[in-house]
Amino acid sequence: MSEIIRVPDIGGDGEVIELLVKTGDLIEVEQGLVVLESAKASMEVPSPKAGVVKSVSVKLGDKLKEGDAIIELEPAAGAAAAPAEAAAVPAAPTQAVDEAEAPSPGASATPAPAAASQEVRVPDIGSAGKARVIEVLVKAGDQVQAEQSLIVLESDKASMEIPSPASGVVESVAIQLNAEVGTGDLILTLRTTGAQAQPTAPAAAAAASPAPAPLAPAAAGPQEVKVPDIGSAGKARVIEVLVKAGDQVQAEQSLIVLESDKASMEIPSPAAGVVESVAVQLNAEVGTGDQILTLRVAGAAPSGPRARGSPGQAAAAPGAAPAPAPVGAPSRNGAKVHAGPAVRQLAREFGVELAAINSTGPRGRILKEDVQAYVKAMMQKAKEAPAAGAASGAGIPPIPPVDFAKYGEIEEVPMTRLMQIGATNLHRSWLNVPHVTQFESADITELEAFRVAQKAVAEKAGVKLTVLPLLLKACAYLLKELPDFNSSLAPSGQALIRKKYVHIGFAVDTPDGLLVPVIRNVDQKSLLQLAAEAAELAEKARSKKLGADAMQGACFTISSLGHIGGTAFTPIVNAPEVAILGVSKASMQPVWDGKAFQPRLMLPLSLSYDHRVINGAAAARFTKRLGDLLADIRAILL
């Protein structure tokens, strides 16, 4: 049978600033249903039972009071109700502190005379002593109503609105934004309109309230600092340890941050001293009375009684650990971040700093939707980062956009996905690898004669023997002879990773862009096997049937433009490889043999290399040896 879950006793009314559940949700005992905010505190209202939400009776912005319906709940079988006191105090630590620090206008002054000027002063703001004006809500000439907020103050423990004690017209405002004010400081002068004024003078509060008992002086020597009363939460998790052994701390300096299912709170030091040892660890569960640390305090003079209503008076030295204060993550300008426990937990799960999030809730409060929107924006930004990096060159000033249409007719043709990926990879390699290119010409007159002589044998085997298999075989031989060319730079930049295998990629020009299939174990295959595999991979690349795994794992790359033309070019190293061989069109050239010029078929070679790994002499030796091998391929057999 369904049950209506109602607002417990919250000491007044509150505005719904967050809905934490929706129809159909399966909820647990003590799971938050809504977050309410009153003039003095914000609090989560938990569910007293587990079950399924049948309907939600409230919406954002609703004003709720004790007994108002929140949801209709279909209890789970055998679900036990939560303790009554837990329901009655939805957010004990947060509410208790905020109420303790918030002013109570009805308990601190004598009534103002009707139809007369009245000075409105800062009421007793408790142990905070001083607070900063973070909002001024009225100006001279404004008509205000009794209980209308005049300013918003923020101390290190709470933020609070100061209400008007009576209706009237603001004659003058005595404070400014960001000013530090204390109990009894003048806020404004109000000309009342004959309504019964509410008390404001702080002296009355001081007279009505008994002075606190004198506090004992802090004795010199070690003192155990324990977890104070953390209310109905019972246990809380240590989410931050702010000090370590040997640290010098001041009185009221935060030591640890605790979090329960209802609130986050900082535990301050009761006295100044040096931390001797820390007894708690990150993520430990602690409760009231558990030891936090041992503090060696210096002897201090006893503090006398302090009248809470006296402005400008120094705070008494604490004799026991004070009540924990709600945590607000500091924003960039030093202000506190306002968010409920559920929102803080969500932010931690995403690894997000609350201070970086723009708030959309009432009075600057961060909502779950704000966290989700921030995470979504960051993910989109990360997704666009590679493209942005490729466009701008990772810090290099980008080329300014040009409106080409003003010069004549244009057509914008989208790049294929393959072209986009290739552009990003090539740009990354160009930016990260210090390129140098070594040029050489190889005499392949005899090699070409050998290739032509073997055409019939190759055709009988069903393959076409081109120069590429011969280049693959010669390069594989050199990669084993000169192992630095068959390596990659370690991520640390302090070592080389030498590969014991010889996999070589070769560039294939396709209608959609450049592809580089990889032939594995080139050193272990015959010329005819290499010719067959190269032809098969090239066909797959052109017909879009080449798998991703067929383009991975290369140690070295050959890019041949011999079938097109050209005398030389500077290929880009395919990182993390350290070298790439460019091959241009062979041509007959006159070569001096010591007696006369002889016609020889010369093949231009262009070796680009990573200068972090390969030096110029090594590159020259590589191209020289490659030229020798191509001039007499029989040397490979030795």
UniProtKB/Swiss-Prot annotation:
**Cellular component aspect of the GO annotation:** cytoplasm; pyruvate dehydrogenase complex
Top class in the EC scheme: transferase
As stated in the Swiss-Prot or TrEMBL entry, residues carrying the post-translational modification N6-lipoyllysine are K40, K157, K262
- Biased-composition ranges, Low complexity, are 90-117, 301-320
Where in the numbering of this chain does the Lipoyl-binding domain appear? 2-74, 117-191, 222-296
> What EC number(s) are associated with this protein in UniProt?
2.3.1.12
Record has Repeat as a keyword: yes
The ranges of region (Catalytic) come to 382-638
Its recorded reaction(s) are: N(6)-[(R)-dihydrolipoyl]-L-lysyl-[protein] + acetyl-CoA = N(6)-[(R)-S(8)-acetyldihydrolipoyl]-L-lysyl-[protein] + CoA
Tell me the segments the record calls region Disordered.
90-119, 201-220, 301-336
Q: Identify which cofactors the protein needs according to its UniProt entry.
A: (R)-lipoate
The biological processes this protein is annotated with in GO are: pyruvate decarboxylation to acetyl-CoA
PROSITE patterns named in the record: BIOTINYL_LIPOYL, LIPOYL, PSBD
Q: Give start and end of each Peripheral subunit-binding (PSBD) domain.
A: 338-375
The molecular function terms of the Gene Ontology recorded here are:
dihydrolipoyllysine-residue acetyltransferase activity; lipoic acid binding
What does the record give as the active site? H611
Q: How does it assemble?
A: Forms a 24-polypeptide structural core with octahedral symmetry.
| Family statement | Belongs to the 2-oxoacid dehydrogenase family.
By what name is this protein known? Answer: Dihydrolipoyllysine-residue acetyltransferase component of pyruvate dehydrogenase complex
Organism whose genome encodes this protein = Azotobacter vinelandii
The lineage, from the top, is: Bacteria, Pseudomonadati, Pseudomonadota, Gammaproteobacteria, Pseudomonadales
